């Protein structure tokens, strides 16, 4: 019987990836469609991706697929053949290729069956996710962004918005997408006659958000086709002025792709302009925060002197401290509240 999951330690897999010299292509894609047997679909696709040497993160659900992956460059054409043939709905599915890519974005393939391909918290049988807003191409985005009757709404999390966003975009200040949906409806209740343009990283969240806004009585709803990734690619190809400023946060080892040269965020430790996200080197913390090179050297990659000191303790004592903490701290913690508390600095609302 074929092995349908990874059996090698993360440390070994990461070391192998870092030692690789073969070029790889980082790509993301998603598709909403009905899967009758998500488990069988997952197992078949996993087997084929393993043979191709694909790394990354893939979520499969009855409502479709959501993937961020890394493919050996010399097998990219094979990968497309496999993917396009995996289901009729995936034939010629749009692939968002990374802008900045050193081939080190992922080191293991994880493919999971979930209830939803994006956690939305929607519990309403009358909601139709296929009834989505109008797609906007890059040139249309640029036309609409200066329209006073149009609002651009960022459907990403606070830490994503902080390092980059469309000009004058509205932030829906939350830690999760499921929180954002009802918040966006409430925030825009008095703007139902305006054009509402939703956007996100690659399109998956803003597409569902556009359907949710229509479901809640908004009429003129749009979303950026392919999200920020596709917008930036097309704008550069077509020589259009970039209306997205800063960095596009991505959920892999890179943690960001530079779209424009603007640095709009600040180091959470000293306040100097910086937009480099990192996780605290103390495994008992692992807080996601922004750190400039000077503070990275000063605090040795940690978020605070406390974590810096703890990191110097023997491994056994570090483990004992982690085990003794009440409830612990979630790995890759992205909570805005925890960031404010841990860093002891006021975080701006926008």
Swiss-Prot record:
Enzyme Commission number(s): 1.14.-.-
Claim: Ion transport is one of the keywords in the record: no
Record-annotated active site: 200
Domain Rhodanese residue range list: 146-240
A GO term, aspect molecular function: oxidoreductase activity, acting on paired donors, with incorporation or reduction of molecular oxygen
Catalytic activity: uridine(34) in tRNA + AH2 + O2 = 5-hydroxyuridine(34) in tRNA + A + H2O
InterPro entries hit by this protein: Rhodanese-like_dom, Rhodanese-like_dom_sf, Rhodanese_C, TrhO, TRHO_N
GO biological process: tRNA modification
The UniProt record lists the keyword Membrane: no
Source organism, top-level taxon: Bacteria
Keywords, comma-separated and alphabetical: Oxidoreductase, tRNA processing
Task performed by this protein: Catalyzes oxygen-dependent 5-hydroxyuridine (ho5U) modification at position 34 in tRNAs.
Membership in a protein family: Belongs to the TrhO family.
Record protein name field: tRNA uridine(34) hydroxylase
Species in which this protein is naturally found: Yersinia enterocolitica serotype O:8 / biotype 1B (strain NCTC 13174 / 8081)
Gene expressing this chain: trhO
